[in-house]
């Protein structure tokens, strides 16, 4: 059992906490994990942190668990176990010798911050962000961490990397253009309001629940970096829409080799799923939509709707997923695997 520090108890950090605590990934983890420490510079009110962990609009009540705040001793008490809570801006100043895995869910992680976790005593530092930095970016089952500090991406990169890996293995990819439709986030607003943007993309400040809003995203390029041989061959766009969770990733691909049929693509996906364990991607023929994926740690390819062949070398492949849960699962799996790997 390896102790974990979670830095950042926002939506992603709280989802990761619940998943680790409930052993949702226990069958896939190389090393069992347990949360023993939290660091958060934003939620400094421990009673509010406990409340937000217990009640979640998307994922529901955390049934069967008792969560409270020990304000005097600066800790959360979860099922009678103590989780120390810190509010340290410089993670290198933390004492992490008893937390071999640190997972940064702040969305503001950098190479220097990842290095800080190792300086503080952790053996493995994972930063959830759509970047590669100098430490690389890992999607479990597609590429591997090269050292004990690495980034893991959000769900959109994971979903896209899976599509690209499947098609590249079977048919080769000349280029790919992506179109992601995803739920609004905390970057969006309830009402039209001013949005500070150096690039003057003021549309991000429009009401998130009422609009289809294009947003900047480097996910396509990052996914192309993660899948070998595809760096520079992938580009695309992302739009936030008025749903609270869930996403679909459409990928339009020009293949190198001839695609025999849609059934051939379905067979390739099914074979990939079989080889990569069922948590990474689900192959289905059930007519799933995005809300059916909420809370699941895997993406889903539904054969009824997720593939179209336009011509012999041009196809569309889609996956649906819960971006937050998929990102949390990948971070935990990469952390556990890296810790267990000599």
What are these regions (language model features)?
Residues 3-18:
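Glycine-rich adenosine-cofactor-binding loop
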Residues 12, 134-203:
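Rossmann-like dinucleotide-binding core of oxidoreductases
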Residues 18, 22, 26-94, 174-175, ...:
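C-terminal substrate-binding/catalytic lobe of Rossmann-fold NAD(P)-dependent oxidoreductases
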Residues 36, 100, 123:
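Conserved acidic residues
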Residues 93-116:
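Hydrophobic alpha-helical hairpins/lids featuring a short glycine-rich hinge
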Residues 103-104, 147-155, 206-213:
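Flexible, glycine/proline-enriched loop segments at strand-loop-helix junctions
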Residues 108-148:
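Rossmann-fold NAD(P)-binding glycine/threonine-rich loop
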Residues 296-330, 334-340:
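Short, charged interaction patches at domain edges and termini
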């Amino acid at each position: 059992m390896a102790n974990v520090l979670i830095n950042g108890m926002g939506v992603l950090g709280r989802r990761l906490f619940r998943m680790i605590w409930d052993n949702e990934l226990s069958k896939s983890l190389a090393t069992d994990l347990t949360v023993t420490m939290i660091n958060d510079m934003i939620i400094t009110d421990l009673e509010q942190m406990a409340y937000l962990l217990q009640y979640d609009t998307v994922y529901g009540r955390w049934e069967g668990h008792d969560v409270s705040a020990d304000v005097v001793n600066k800790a959360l008490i979860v099922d009678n176990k103590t989780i120390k809570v810190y509010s340290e801006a410089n993670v290198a100043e933390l004492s992490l010798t008893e937390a071999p895995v640190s997972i940064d869910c702040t969305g503001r992680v950098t190479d220097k911050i990842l290095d800080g976790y190792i300086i503080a005593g952790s053996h493995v530092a994972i930063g959830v962000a759509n970047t590669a930095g100098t430490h690389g970016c890992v999607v479990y089952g597609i590429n591997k961490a090269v050292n004990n500090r690495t980034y893991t991406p959000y769900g959109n990169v994971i979903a896209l990397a899976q599509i690209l890996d499947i098609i590249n293995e079977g048919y080769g990819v000349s280029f790919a253009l992506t179109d992601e439709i995803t739920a609004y986030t905390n970057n969006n607003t309830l009402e039209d309001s001013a949005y500070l943007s150096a690039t003057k993309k003021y549309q991000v400040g429009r009401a998130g629940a009422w609009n289809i809003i294009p947003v900047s995203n480097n996910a396509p390029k990052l996914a192309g970096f993660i899948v070998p041989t595809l760096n520079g061959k992938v580009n695309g766009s992302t739009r936030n829409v008025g749903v609270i969770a869930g996403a679909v990733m459409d990928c339009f691909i020009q293949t190198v080799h001839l695609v025999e049929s849609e059934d051939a693509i379905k067979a390739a996906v099914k074979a990939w799923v079989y080889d990569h364990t069922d948590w990474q991607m689900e192959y289905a023929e059930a007519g799933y939509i995005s809300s059916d994926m909420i809370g699941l740690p895997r993406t889903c390819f539904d054969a009824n709707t997720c593939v179209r062949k336009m011509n012999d070398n041009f196809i569309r492949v889609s996956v649906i997923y819960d971006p937050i849960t998929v990102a949390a699962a990948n971070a935990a799996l990469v952390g556990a695997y890296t810790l267990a790997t000599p």
